[in-house]
Amino acid sequence: MSNIDFKALERAANETRGLSMDAVAKAASGHLGLPLGSAEIGAALFGNSLIYNPKDTRWLNRDYFVLSAGHGSMFLYSWLHLSGYDVSIEDIKNFRQLNSKTPGHPKFHDTPGVEATTGPLGQGIANAVGIASACKMAAGKFNTEQHQIFNQKVVVLVGDGCLQEGISQEAISFAGHHRLDNLIVFYDSNDVTLDAMAIETQSEDAVKRFESVGFEVQLVLEGNNIGSLINAYQNAKHSKSGKPQIIICKTTIAKGIPEVAGTNKGHGEAGVKFIDSARKNLGLPEEKFFVSGETRQYFEQHEKQLEKLYQEWQATFAEWKSANPKLAQLLESAHEKHEAIDIMKQIPEFPTTPIIATRKAGSDVLQPISQYLPLSVSGSADLHGSTLNYIKEGRDFTPACPTGRNIKFGIREHAMGAMMNGIAYHGLFKVSGATFLVFSDYLRPAIRLAALSHLPVVYIFTHDSVGVGEDGPTHQPVETVSGLRMIPNLDVIRPADPEETAAAFSLAYARADGPTLLSLTRQNLPFLPGTAQKKREGTLRGGYIVVSETAPLRMILIATGSEVQHCVEAAKLLGDDIRVVSMPCTELFDRQSNEYKQSVLPSGCRNRIAMEAGVTSFWYKYVGLDGKVIGIDRFGMSAPGNAVMKQLGMTSENLVNISKQ
């Protein structure tokens, strides 16, 4: 913006240093290095360059700011406070305290103005790439020649640690290839990591690294010079190169505390003991948590300037809605909630022949869902041909086709997971992503953050057991499903036939308060007994009775996915006093009423056997000390899938034998 008051911005930068020092000192915990070293970056962005509205934090066309180096959270909280967001001085005083708005690392939903949950290094830059992708999709879908309602920038602040993490390379490679020119990376290049100087662990040329993947690079040698930073931002914002941008800022970690500045001791809270002298060095008064009247006045005026831009956009938006009622209706639909039962009605019942794999059933289910939810997008880590989650009526997302609904993430599972989170943070698109279940370990940190942040993403993970067969134990998950069930707020659904799969996808696409993981087979599975309606409705409750006993109940067989068929066959051999329960989603079943759970698994029947082609430990919560679990507590082997299953005891015959022991 014109008429830059550099004195005011420099004063604000120093006052955020004071806020950060006081907050970390009061908490006796936290990180000073980035908030002090990057204060001028904050001044250039929040005090001049970013377009935002603190009164409308979800404004559709705001610029996004993601703090990838989440340990520097006081940087963000300080600037949000000055910028007029609902982050008070009292909130800053409660930094890292119980139930505060200012947790140790930024958390989506907890703090107004925080765009992404960050802290695990590298996640934020991949989140930003996902957000930038979603912004491209939105612009492609909704902008017209007359009205550009989406033209924002996505800014992410990264440090040396973020860029050492492998996920960063996956993310920037995607961004460069897809020419995400709405992405601007600020690299706080202070040459220091927690343990030592960065030169002890890296010697790469950052300029060449980013240029090689398609970024336009600017190097700001005086990374604490506000004028240089603003100029660099404006150059990046108005670049005609069609490339994503990175501004490498050579900064001094913990600037303002000479005793630790420029060293690894400045990373954490070690500098707290020197803050009294630092306050004098920075020209700050002795008063703690001090913000001057001049700084508050500056930001009040700045907010008024931003409000003008906001109102201008609102006028354009109103014109756009009037001129494009169908597009306006589509945009509004992004915020509509959908019930699983309504989504499920869009999916025709399956013919009972031929038998098919649940991954194939998933493909058949995805097509009507994608028509019903036109703002849904689906991606894969170079496995669309195997995971079968390609939206057939949607083209590929490319620079030339930003409206494409199929995202080719490439063989970048970790970035895929974090980019999916970014698309979900954006909020307009329902995103799913696919790979083989065994490779979920590559993106588990992103799955965990999706669950923590209550992001409604959908994971479509196929080839879900030793039934994979010939590829062998490297590709045969055994511990994976149980491990994923341990993540709070993640619903894991392992359907047993196409009708259960229809309900599973409906649940996943309806869920708005967290992620859902679909575990699907490579191998064909028979249809379970019962009507499509019974199986679908039962799946919506997480677990249900597939085969009812016709004599006094003697035993309950519990299974998921490909093993339910063995329980059904075993029940035929064991007698009419056997009940078979399919439990595709234990998390959902656990959320049912006690009355319903007792109707399916009555506590009076303690003779229970659970069967799943994976580790056994998880299932004892359902079978109890008197029950048995048939599973696989070892790695698999390379052979045809049926042979591996038989060798490892995943058969109805083995189930019958164990039931008699």
Curated annotation (Swiss-Prot):
Q: How does it assemble?
A: Homodimer.
Record's catalysed reaction(s): D-sedoheptulose 7-phosphate + D-glyceraldehyde 3-phosphate = aldehydo-D-ribose 5-phosphate + D-xylulose 5-phosphate
Please state what the protein is called: Transketolase
Q: What class of enzyme is it?
A: transferase
Q: Which InterPro entries match?
A: THDP-binding, Transketo_C/PFOR_II, Transketolase-like_C_2, Transketolase-like_Pyr-bd, Transketolase_bac-like, Transketolase_BS, Transketolase_CS, Transketolase_fam
Instruction: Give the record's family classification.
Output: Belongs to the transketolase family.
Instruction: Give the record's keywords alphabetically.
Output: Acetylation, Calcium, Magnesium, Metal-binding, Thiamine pyrophosphate, Transferase
> Which Pfam families does the entry mention?
Transket_pyr (PF02779), Transketolase_C_1 (PF22613), Transketolase_N (PF00456)
Textual note on the cofactor? Binds 1 Mg(2+) ion per subunit. Can also utilize other divalent metal cations, such as Ca(2+), Mn(2+) and Co(2+). Binds 1 thiamine pyrophosphate per subunit.
